[in-house]
Design a protein with these regions (language model features):
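Alpha-helical support elements that line or immediately flank enzyme active sites
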Residues: 1-22, 55-69, 159-177, 221, ...
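Glycine-rich, mobile lid/loop segments that gate access to catalytic sites or pores
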Residues: 7-107, 113
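Terminal-appendage/accessory-domain detector
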Residues: 92, 96-109, 116-346
Length: 346
């Protein structure tokens, strides 16, 4: 597979426009079809699945385009990918956070494996979450409506379901800059059930800190920002963050649970040390389509998250992406993305 993909993207300059278009087309195909496979899976299963449970479908769709599969081979690859995909029960990792995360690696592996097997003639059709009549509504408007346009960019490196509470807190602090850790006695988070399950007041490792609500909220308030350094390493055991985290209560609100998963929402009640209270409105996460991050905010997020690459490497990655449209070779242009960092990560 990798050799064939390199053949597609390693063309000479005369084919540069074609290969750049193919790269972006394949990316769009992969994301769009994986998202639709996800909505189909969620609609036909009582379990809330992590994205690794359906992303293999997107890998196959993108790969089949690049490798010019015929219809029969493509169909079998989809069936193989679906059949071998991981189960990925999301709530298990929420309730017991580990390095399994959202199983992105499993989805990528399964998709690539399905492409290889189908190329060798292995059969596997049909993929029920693509072909079954019960999921037709998730595929009928393909090419007319884009699921990609309904997606989001997380401002912070923690679970998606914690983001509304973080957004609400920043808005309260924008209105009242005096709402600092020293001024807060207690903080009550009302949210939907799945978000309530995050809890996470005293994490013991980075996985627990990032699949949490109380701790990252406390870290944001205490440190004034929430990046990788606030949910890894020494910060996890920082006394000032933990002191506030222990004063945060996370509870389910029935009205917000009723609106999930169509909306993910939270509201906060902050009690100051003088006894006064401030209540946030019901708040959606920053970075959703209706509250999209600006290009500058996305670049700032990249700079914060890529700091451990070193400035030179991080800038090379940004430059590679910006210049892709003018590059003679997509593979060569994107080399900085795949280079290992020479900086050690603590």
């Amino acid at each position: 597979v990798f050799g064939e993909v390199h053949r597609v993207f390693g063309a000479d300059a005369a084919g540069a426009d074609h290969q750049r278009h193919e790269l972006l087309t394949a990316l769009c195909i992969g994301y769009e079809t994986a998202l639709r496979a996800g909505t189909a899976l969620m609609a036909t299963s009582p379990t809330y699945h992590a994205s690794g449970g359906f992303s293999a479908i997107g890998v196959v769709c993108a790969g089949a385009r690049l490798l010019d599969f015929d219809a029969a081979t493509f169909r079998h690859a989809l069936g193989i990918a679906e059949y071998f995909s991981a189960r990925c029960p999301m709530m298990r990792v929420v309730l017991a956070p580990t390095m399994l995360r959202d199983a992105h690696g499993a989805g990528a592996f399964t998709g690539l494996n399905a492409l290889l097997m189908a190329m060798e003639g292995v059969t596997g059709a049909p993929a029920e979450t693509v072909e079954d009549a019960s999921v037709a509504e998730h595929w009928n408007d393909l090419g007319q409506r884009w699921e990609i346009d309904s997606q989001y960019f997380k401002p912070w490196p923690v679970c998606r379901w914690a983001q509304p509470a973080l957004t609400a807190m920043l808005e309260l602090q924008r209105i009242d800059p005096g709402l600092t850790a020293d001024a807060i006695e207690t903080l009550r988070v009302e949210t939907f059930y799945e978000s309530m399950c995050l809890q996470g007041h005293t994490p013991q490792d980075a996985d627990q800190a990032q699949y949490a609500l109380a701790f990252p909220l406390a870290a944001l308030i205490v440190r004034g920002r929430l990046g990788p350094d606030e949910v890894t390493g020494a910060a996890i055991h920082a006394a000032d963050i933990l002191a506030l985290s222990r004063r945060i209560e996370v509870v389910e609100a029935a009205d917000l649970s009723a609106r999930f998963p169509g909306e993910i929402l939270s509201r906060l009640t902050v009690t100051r040390k003088d006894g006064s209270q401030v209540v946030s409105p019901i708040t959606a996460a920053r970075g959703d389509p209706a509250t999209a991050l600006t290009a500058l905010e996305l670049e700032h997020k990249f700079d914060l998250f890529a700091a451990r690459l070193g400035q030179e490497h991080a800038q090379a990655v940004k430059q590679a992406v910006r210049q892709l449209a003018r590059a003679p070779s997509a593979i060569v242009a994107l080399e900085p993305l795949f280079q290992a960092s020479d900086r050690s990560v603590p």
